[in-house]
Curated annotation (Swiss-Prot):
Any one of the GO CC terms: cytosol
Natural source organism: Buchnera aphidicola subsp. Schizaphis graminum (strain Sg)
Name of the protein: Transcription antitermination protein NusB
Domain of life according to the entry: Bacteria
Transmembrane domains' residue ranges: none
Length: 138
């Protein structure tokens, strides 16, 4: 089955919202996801990818954060929760999903920042991911 790119984009946006909620509440991510998806129109979301992101990121959160640290201009504690969640999604894709071109991961991170972040957060996300991509490039 071929997954449409916009289904993946929606999965990333939903994952971002779940990761943001999880970071603040520390609730069980799987239980929260079930409740979250009850309220969403799941028809146009890549549900499998959504679950892969939230489970993969929450289980590997410390290692993902460690991968990000060398590319950040400030500490993780100083990052906004939205920016942190976006970077976690992007770094997860860069390191764990070799089938996704790095340019796609970067672009999707920037688009999430434009949609959910503060006014200039897309510039920050772009800078961090560009630096990381130079090292990671596949």
């Amino acid at each position: 089955m071929i997954i449409k790119p916009n289904f993946r984009r929606k999965a990333r946006a939903c994952a971002l919202q779940m990761l943001y909620s999880w970071e603040i509440s520390q609730n069980n991510i799987k239980d929260s996801a079930i409740e979250f998806l009850k309220e969403k129109n799941k028809k146009n979301i890549d549900i499998i990818y959504f679950y892969e992101l939230i489970i993969g990121i929450t289980y590997n959160c410390r290692s993902i954060d460690d991968l990000m640290k060398p590319y950040l201009s400030r500490s993780l504690k100083e990052l906004g929760q939205i920016e942190k969640a976006i970077l976690r999604i992007s770094f997860y894709e860069l390191y764990k999903r070799k089938d996704i071109p790095y340019k796609v991961s970067i672009n999707e991170g920037i688009e999430l920042a434009k949609l959910f972040g503060s006014e200039d957060s897309h510039k920050f996300i772009n800078g961090v991911l560009d630096k990381a991509a130079l090292k990671i490039k596949r």
